[in-house]
Protein backbone atom coordinates (compact mmCIF):
# COMPACT_ATOMS: atom_id res chain seq x y z
CA UNK A 1 0.00 0.00 0.00
CA UNK A 2 2.84 2.39 0.85
CA UNK A 3 4.37 1.77 -2.57
CA UNK A 4 1.12 2.46 -4.45
CA UNK A 5 0.41 5.59 -2.42
CA UNK A 6 4.01 6.68 -3.04
CA UNK A 7 3.37 6.42 -6.78
CA UNK A 8 0.46 8.84 -6.44
CA UNK A 9 -2.36 6.29 -6.49
CA UNK A 10 -5.37 6.98 -4.28
CA UNK A 11 -5.95 3.97 -2.04
CA UNK A 12 -9.49 3.14 -0.94
CA UNK A 13 -9.01 0.72 1.96
CA UNK A 14 -12.34 -1.01 2.46
CA UNK A 15 -11.33 -2.50 5.83
CA UNK A 16 -14.78 -2.04 7.41
CA UNK A 17 -13.16 -1.71 10.83
CA UNK A 18 -15.27 -2.78 13.81
CA UNK A 19 -13.58 -3.62 17.09
CA UNK A 20 -12.94 -2.18 20.53
CA UNK A 21 -11.98 1.49 20.59
CA UNK A 22 -8.25 1.00 21.24
CA UNK A 23 -7.92 -1.42 18.34
CA UNK A 24 -9.84 0.84 15.94
CA UNK A 25 -7.82 3.88 17.00
CA UNK A 26 -4.47 2.09 16.56
CA UNK A 27 -5.46 0.52 13.25
CA UNK A 28 -6.66 3.86 11.91
CA UNK A 29 -3.43 5.56 13.02
CA UNK A 30 -1.35 2.94 11.20
CA UNK A 31 -3.48 3.23 8.07
CA UNK A 32 -3.31 7.03 8.17
CA UNK A 33 0.51 6.79 8.11
CA UNK A 34 0.39 4.44 5.10
CA UNK A 35 -0.87 7.13 2.75
CA UNK A 36 -4.30 5.61 2.12
CA UNK A 37 -6.83 8.18 0.90
CA UNK A 38 -10.00 6.52 2.21
CA UNK A 39 -10.79 4.09 5.04
CA UNK A 40 -14.11 2.43 5.87
CA UNK A 41 -15.29 1.87 9.44
CA UNK A 42 -18.62 0.33 10.45
CA UNK A 43 -20.90 3.13 11.65
CA UNK A 44 -22.62 1.06 14.31
CA UNK A 45 -21.81 3.20 17.35
CA UNK A 46 -20.26 6.53 18.28
CA UNK A 47 -17.40 5.00 20.34
CA UNK A 48 -16.01 3.16 17.32
CA UNK A 49 -16.39 6.21 15.08
CA UNK A 50 -14.77 8.59 17.56
CA UNK A 51 -11.85 6.16 18.02
CA UNK A 52 -11.24 6.22 14.26
CA UNK A 53 -11.27 10.03 14.26
CA UNK A 54 -8.71 10.07 17.10
CA UNK A 55 -6.58 7.55 15.23
CA UNK A 56 -6.61 9.62 12.07
CA UNK A 57 -5.33 12.67 13.89
CA UNK A 58 -4.43 15.40 11.39
CA UNK A 59 -3.75 13.01 8.50
CA UNK A 60 -5.46 13.58 5.15
CA UNK A 61 -7.18 10.18 5.40
CA UNK A 62 -10.91 10.41 4.60
CA UNK A 63 -13.03 8.35 6.99
CA UNK A 64 -16.18 6.73 5.61
CA UNK A 65 -18.82 5.13 7.83
CA UNK A 66 -20.37 1.93 6.51
CA UNK A 67 -24.09 2.31 7.19
CA UNK A 68 -25.78 -0.94 6.09
CA UNK A 69 -24.19 -3.36 3.64
CA UNK A 70 -25.96 -3.33 0.27
CA UNK A 71 -26.48 -7.09 0.28
CA UNK A 72 -28.58 -6.97 3.47
CA UNK A 73 -32.34 -7.01 3.18
CA UNK A 74 -35.02 -6.85 5.89
CA UNK A 75 -34.67 -10.54 6.76
CA UNK A 76 -30.92 -10.21 7.21
CA UNK A 77 -31.33 -7.22 9.51
CA UNK A 78 -34.00 -9.03 11.53
CA UNK A 79 -31.64 -12.00 11.90
CA UNK A 80 -29.17 -9.59 13.55
CA UNK A 81 -31.86 -8.35 15.94
CA UNK A 82 -32.35 -5.11 14.03
CA UNK A 83 -36.03 -4.36 13.54
CA UNK A 84 -35.61 -1.03 11.77
CA UNK A 85 -35.62 -1.15 7.97
CA UNK A 86 -32.49 0.01 6.15
CA UNK A 87 -34.28 3.18 5.06
CA UNK A 88 -34.46 4.22 8.75
CA UNK A 89 -31.18 2.70 9.95
CA UNK A 90 -28.95 4.21 7.25
CA UNK A 91 -29.70 7.88 8.08
CA UNK A 92 -29.31 7.18 11.79
CA UNK A 93 -25.87 5.64 11.28
CA UNK A 94 -24.86 8.33 8.79
CA UNK A 95 -25.72 10.99 11.36
CA UNK A 96 -23.54 9.20 13.94
CA UNK A 97 -20.66 9.26 11.44
CA UNK A 98 -21.10 12.94 10.65
CA UNK A 99 -21.41 13.86 14.33
CA UNK A 100 -18.17 11.96 15.08
CA UNK A 101 -16.27 13.94 12.43
CA UNK A 102 -16.30 11.50 9.51
CA UNK A 103 -15.96 12.75 5.95
CA UNK A 104 -18.76 10.62 4.57
CA UNK A 105 -20.52 7.28 4.45
CA UNK A 106 -20.85 4.18 2.34
CA UNK A 107 -24.51 3.71 1.48
CA UNK A 108 -26.80 2.26 -1.14
CA UNK A 109 -28.01 4.66 -3.76
CA UNK A 110 -31.51 3.93 -2.52
CA UNK A 111 -30.81 6.09 0.54
CA UNK A 112 -28.46 8.63 -1.09
CA UNK A 113 -31.07 11.32 -1.78
CA UNK A 114 -32.30 11.38 1.82
CA UNK A 115 -28.70 11.44 3.08
CA UNK A 116 -27.73 14.28 0.77
CA UNK A 117 -30.71 16.35 1.95
CA UNK A 118 -30.03 15.60 5.62
CA UNK A 119 -26.23 15.80 5.75
CA UNK A 120 -25.40 18.45 3.17
CA UNK A 121 -23.47 18.73 -0.07
CA UNK A 122 -19.94 18.42 1.38
CA UNK A 123 -20.54 15.08 3.14
CA UNK A 124 -19.30 12.26 0.89
CA UNK A 125 -21.66 9.47 -0.16
CA UNK A 126 -19.87 6.45 -1.60
CA UNK A 127 -22.33 4.11 -3.29
CA UNK A 128 -21.51 0.42 -3.82
CA UNK A 129 -23.82 -2.16 -5.35
CA UNK A 130 -23.82 -0.33 -8.67
CA UNK A 131 -25.38 -2.33 -11.48
CA UNK A 132 -25.76 -0.99 -15.03
CA UNK A 133 -29.26 -1.01 -16.52
CA UNK A 134 -30.20 -4.59 -17.37
CA UNK A 135 -27.39 -6.20 -15.34
CA UNK A 136 -27.94 -8.93 -12.77
CA UNK A 137 -28.11 -7.78 -9.16
CA UNK A 138 -26.14 -10.84 -7.94
CA UNK A 139 -26.14 -10.76 -4.12
CA UNK A 140 -26.98 -7.04 -3.96
CA UNK A 141 -30.48 -6.53 -2.55
CA UNK A 142 -30.30 -2.72 -2.70
CA UNK A 143 -28.49 -2.20 -6.02
CA UNK A 144 -29.01 0.85 -8.24
CA UNK A 145 -27.83 1.96 -11.67
CA UNK A 146 -25.00 4.47 -12.05
CA UNK A 147 -27.52 7.03 -13.30
CA UNK A 148 -29.86 6.53 -10.33
CA UNK A 149 -26.98 6.82 -7.84
CA UNK A 150 -25.68 10.03 -9.40
CA UNK A 151 -29.13 11.58 -9.61
CA UNK A 152 -29.68 10.70 -5.93
CA UNK A 153 -26.52 12.56 -4.92
CA UNK A 154 -23.75 9.95 -4.73
CA UNK A 155 -20.23 11.40 -4.62
CA UNK A 156 -18.43 8.22 -5.70
CA UNK A 157 -19.60 4.94 -7.23
CA UNK A 158 -18.15 1.52 -6.47
CA UNK A 159 -18.44 -0.86 -9.42
CA UNK A 160 -17.00 -4.35 -9.16
CA UNK A 161 -18.45 -7.48 -10.71
CA UNK A 162 -20.23 -5.80 -13.63
CA UNK A 163 -16.70 -5.07 -14.86
CA UNK A 164 -14.52 -7.80 -13.36
CA UNK A 165 -16.85 -10.65 -14.35
CA UNK A 166 -17.83 -9.31 -17.75
CA UNK A 167 -16.78 -11.17 -20.89
CA UNK A 168 -15.31 -7.88 -22.08
CA UNK A 169 -14.24 -5.91 -18.96
CA UNK A 170 -12.99 -2.92 -20.96
CA UNK A 171 -16.22 -2.71 -22.94
CA UNK A 172 -18.29 -3.06 -19.77
CA UNK A 173 -16.31 -0.28 -18.09
CA UNK A 174 -16.70 1.97 -21.13
CA UNK A 175 -20.49 1.46 -21.11
CA UNK A 176 -20.64 2.32 -17.42
CA UNK A 177 -18.56 5.46 -18.01
CA UNK A 178 -20.98 6.44 -20.80
CA UNK A 179 -23.93 5.97 -18.41
CA UNK A 180 -22.15 8.10 -15.79
CA UNK A 181 -21.33 10.83 -18.32
CA UNK A 182 -24.94 10.84 -19.48
CA UNK A 183 -26.17 11.22 -15.90
CA UNK A 184 -23.71 14.07 -15.32
CA UNK A 185 -24.75 15.77 -18.55
CA UNK A 186 -21.21 15.56 -19.91
List where the protein language model places each region:
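N-terminal amphipathic alpha-helix/helix-capping segment at the start of soluble metabolic enzymes
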Residues: 5-6, 113-120, 144, 178-181, ...
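Glycine-rich phosphate-binding active-site loops on the catalytic face of alpha/beta enzymes
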Residues: 34-46, 131-132, 140-172
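Active-site cofactor/substrate anionic-group-binding motifs, chiefly glycine-
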Residues: 1-20, 157
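Short, glycine/acidic-enriched capping/hinge loops at junctions between secondary-structure elements
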Residues: 1, 24, 137-139
Amino acid sequence: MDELAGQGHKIFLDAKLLDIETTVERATAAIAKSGAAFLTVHATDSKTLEAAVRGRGNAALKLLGVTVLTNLGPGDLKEQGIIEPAVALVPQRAQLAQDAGFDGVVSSGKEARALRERLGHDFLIVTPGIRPAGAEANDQTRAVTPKAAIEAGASYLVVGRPITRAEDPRGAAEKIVEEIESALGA
